[in-house]
Amino acid sequence: MRLNTLSPAPGRVTSRKRVGRGIGSGLGKTAGRGHKGLKSRSGGTVKPGFEGGQMPLQKRLPKYGFTSRIGRVSAEIRLSELNKVEADVIDLDALLKADLISTNIKRAKIFLSGELKKAVTVKGLAVTKGAKAAIEAAGGKVEE
């Protein structure tokens, strides 16, 4: 056996159906699509969720919830990221200059992840309990 002598098993490859080529073929005239109706038309497919005119399930169920827009103006800052900030007093402006937050951010919260290597004063930012303890352990302080 060689690569150039390989052939598919008998019955494996079937020729494609040629439809609409006369009544003798068995697939003439309507080409196996039946008479009229959506599925007989060209481009005729039933849209997902369509239930024949009955009110579809996704419209029968109630709406719920909403997308909170506060996340668009809030940021989470890791404790280890504070090492990148040059300033001794860390506030929103200092975070912006250090390129840790974007210009549309109005509030930020510092959480405990990594370690702080220098003493800093955090001003006007929300701080978790663990992060506050770590900042104070590094010799810094948290101001409201």
Curated annotation (Swiss-Prot):
Binds to the 23S rRNA. InterPro entries: Ribosomal_uL15 (IPR030878), Ribosomal_uL15/eL18 (IPR021131), Ribosomal_uL15/eL18_sf (IPR036227), Ribosomal_uL15_bac-type (IPR005749). The keyword Metal-binding does not apply. This is Large ribosomal subunit protein uL15. The gene is rplO. NCBIfam families: rplO_bact. The lineage of its organism: Bacteria, Pseudomonadati, Pseudomonadota, Gammaproteobacteria, Cellvibrionales. Residues 1-54 are annotated as: Disordered. GO terms for molecular function: rRNA binding; structural constituent of ribosome. It holds the Pfam family Ribosomal_L27A. Keywords: Ribonucleoprotein, Ribosomal protein, RNA-binding, rRNA-binding. It comes from Teredinibacter turnerae (strain ATCC 39867 / T7901). GO terms for biological process: translation. It comes from the Bacteria. Part of the 50S ribosomal subunit. The keyword Ribonucleoprotein applies.
